[in-house]
UniProtKB/Swiss-Prot annotation:
The modification Phosphothreonine is found at T220, T222. One of its GO terms (molecular function) is RNA polymerase II cis-regulatory region sequence-specific DNA binding. The keyword Transcription applies. This is Nuclear receptor subfamily 2 group C member 1. Its main location: nucleus. One of its GO terms (biological process) is positive regulation of retinoic acid receptor signaling pathway. The keyword Ubl conjugation applies. Residues 110-185 bind DNA. Residues 584-603 are annotated as: Required for interaction with NRIP1. It comes from the Eukaryota. Sumoylation requires both PIAS1 and UBE2I. Sumoylation appears to dissociate NR2C1 from the PML nuclear bodies. Enhances the interaction with NRIP1 but inhibits interaction with KAT2B. In proliferating cells, stimulation by all-trans retinoic acid, activation of MAPK1-mediated phosphorylation and recruitment to PML bodies with subsequent sumoylation, suppresses OCT4 expression. Phosphorylated on several serine and threonine residues. Phosphorylation on Thr-220, stimulated by all-trans retinoic acid (atRA) mediates PML location and sumoylation in proliferating cells which then modulates its association with effector molecules, KAT2B and NRIP1. Phosphorylation on Ser-581 by PKC is important for protein stability and function as activator of RARB.
Length: 603
């Protein structure tokens, strides 16, 4: 007797059909032994895919028309059943109904969708499909959507379950002959904006991440590309992590929030971008009355030809303060109040060090860090959208960056170094502070999902030849370093005091070239280390090597490339503007003005 595989191949060769999911129960079935090979109407038994008890007897008879088979369950009644091979390799499928109604006549044929079994509306893109699968295939190809299957890539696709797995549905469309090159490019509006913001990268590629609150690792990233848009020429060839346009539409697989809805439920999700844009616009407005050379300097701001530090000299303190109105949303007002009071309470403990190195630093007794420096509460954009986009990720990252700078400003010893030294330290070590913040806010930011999405998008770009292997390797190494570092920190169960002292040790690093008062900075670092050691000795007396384990994690921070961090987390908000160009504006604000804005503009 022939095997199941041989019978399946015979049926396919005779164009008699193929076995697929049964529509009523959604249960997958496979062809088994033909009971009688001599009868004109061939008889089959359909069983479950695991070979369990036979479920139904099917009588199949060949009609005079080649390639058509009429099926009657249990030799009576009217029913519809269609077939496919288990590996979805079939090139043809014909579904027919044996209808005995006297009004319609015998053997009336109904064309059903080869993908899901719904009533077909015609041949679309090379295959007989329904309107639903036609639209799904068109959207997927036009927008170059990439789906992922949460199962074993063999999900049931029928009329009732076709929306559960977009990956398997798209693969099924392609397997049954729907041609990708038959989908025409989407028509563009006649009127196209001739100018694009110089502060944002020119790209409309987006990442949409399906949120799963139960598991941060089960994300379904969707990668959207507009090939007709001018692309950024930054580190990522195709600007794949950039999202410029917040507007969108609702589809079966992804909810793209419209701009007005996003504003109403999330507030201003462009904190960092608003700061950069506001500063640039302020400079352009004030410079209208100045000569053309100064105007050229301002116009080159967004191209990173001129440092934002130079641009700062043209602004008054009031103008800069107003430009940072949106920055206040990034921070917790309660925490800012505590930090402000702590700074005020410690006035007089240190004397500010000016550029004149002849002034000696004097210090009163007291710790480098107080209890107010332990709290590090990141306020995420609220509420979280059902599907996170890269703009939301960038806004979350910018809030973490601002919170880290605000934390540094709240340390009296840091302020005592003077403005130039403070700016130099933060510009040198913002990436290390940001990475420590990622580890500390691992769960709040859902960092695991963000990193997994970056990896999936890099893999997709390589498959589509959008990125060289060397470039992909560079980015993947950085992402894996981030993941390894954050995972190691999470496993150590580091508390708030330990994170605060680790950040202080990183912040007061005297080995950056160009720093003044290096001996004083080194003294602050030594004090942070001594206090850190005392805290661990008192808090974890039984963990002899805890201090060593924590300090040994710091060298890994130096391996993180700040340029790649900017590409991944911030380019979608500020384009090619460098983070170290924005830092001076934040640190040059007066603490009182900074904190008052936080209190007055909290979310």
């Amino acid at each position: 007797m022939a095997t199941i595989e041989e019978i399946a191949h015979q049926i396919i060769e005779q164009q008699m059909g193929e076995i697929v999911t049964e529509q009523q129960t959604g249960q997958k079935i496979q062809i088994v032994t033909a009971l009688d090979h001599n009868t004109q109407g061939k008889q089959f038994i359909l069983t479950n895919h695991d070979g369990s008890t036979p479920s139904k007897v099917i009588l199949a008879r060949q009609d005079s028309t080649p390639g058509k088979v009429f099926l009657t369950p249990d030799a009576a009644g009217v029913n519809q059943l269609f077939f496919t091979t288990p590996d979805l390799s079939a090139q043809h499928l014909q579904l027919l109904t044996d209808n005995s109604s006297p009004d319609q006549g015998p053997n009336k044929v109904f064309d059903l969708c080869v993908v899901c079994g719904d009533k077909a509306s015609g041949r679309h893109y090379g295959a007989v499909t329904c309107e639903g699968c036609k639209g799904f295939f068109k959207r997927s190809i036009r927008k170059n959507l990439v789906y992922s299957c949460r199962g074993s890539k063999d999900c049931i696709i029928n009329k009732h379950h076709r929306n559960r797995c977009q990956y398997c549905r798209l693969q099924r469309c392609i397997a049954f002959g729907m041609k990708q090159d038959s989908v025409q490019c989407e028509r563009k509006p006649i009127e196209v904006s001739r100018e694009k913001s110089s502060n944002c990268a020119a790209s409309t590629e987006k990442i949409y991440i399906r949120k799963d609150l139960r598991s941060p690792l089960t994300a379904t990233p969707t990668f959207v590309t507009d090939s007709e848009t001018t692309r950024s020429t930054g580190l990522l060839d195709s600007g794949m992590f950039v999202n410029i346009h917040p507007s969108g539409v609702k589809t079966e697989s992804t909810v793209l929030m419209t701009s007005d809805k996003a504003e109403s439920c999330q507030g201003d999700l462009s904190t960092l971008a608003s700061v950069v844009t506001s500063l640039a616009n302020l400079g352009k407005t004030k410079d209208l009355s100045q000569n053309s050379n100064e105007m050229s300097m301002i116009e080159s701001l967004s191209n990173d030809d001129t440092s934002l530090c130079e641009f700062q000299e043209m602004q008054t303190n009031g103008d800069v303060s107003r430009a940072f109105d949106t920055l206040a949303k990034a921070l917790n007002p309660g925490e800012s109040t505590a930090c402000q009071s702590s700074v005020a309470g410690m006035e007089g403990s240190v004397h500010l060090i000016t550029g004149d190195s002849s002034i000696n630093y004097t210090e009163k007794e007291g710790p480098l860090l107080s209890d107010s420096h332990v709290a590090f509460r990141l306020t995420m954009p609220s509420p979280m959208p059902e599907y996170l986009n890269v703009h939301y990720i960038g806004e979350s990252a910018s809030r973490l960056l601002f919170l880290s700078m605000h934390w540094a400003l709240s340390i009296p010893s840091f302020q005592a170094l003077g403005q130039e030294n403070s700016i130099s330290l933060v510009k040198a070590y913002w990436n290390e502070l940001f990475t420590l913040g990622l580890a500390q806010c691992w769960q709040v930011m859902n960092v695991a999902t963000i990193l997994a999405t970056f990896v999936n998008c890099l893999h997709n770009s390589l498959q589509q030849d959008k990125m060289s292997t060397e470039r992909r390797k560079l980015l993947m190494e950085h992402i894996f370093k981030l993941q390894e570092f954050c995972n190691s920190m999470v496993k150590l169960c580091i508390d708030g005091y330990e994170y605060a002292y680790l950040k202080a040790i990183v912040l007061f690093s005297p080995d950056h070239p160009g720093l003044e008062n290096m001996e004083q900075i080194e003294k602050f670092q030594e004090k942070a280390y001594v206090e850190f050691q005392d805290y661990i000795t008192k808090t974890y007396p039984d963990d002899t090597y805890r201090l060593s384990r924590l300090l040994l994690r710091l060298p890994a921070l130096r391996l993180m490339n700040a340029t790649i961090t900017e590409e991944l987390f911030f380019k979608g908000l500020i384009g090619n503007i460098r983070i170290d160009s924005v830092i001076p504006h934040i640190l040059k604000m007066e603490p009182a003005d900074y904190n008052s804005q936080i209190i007055g503009h909290s979310i």
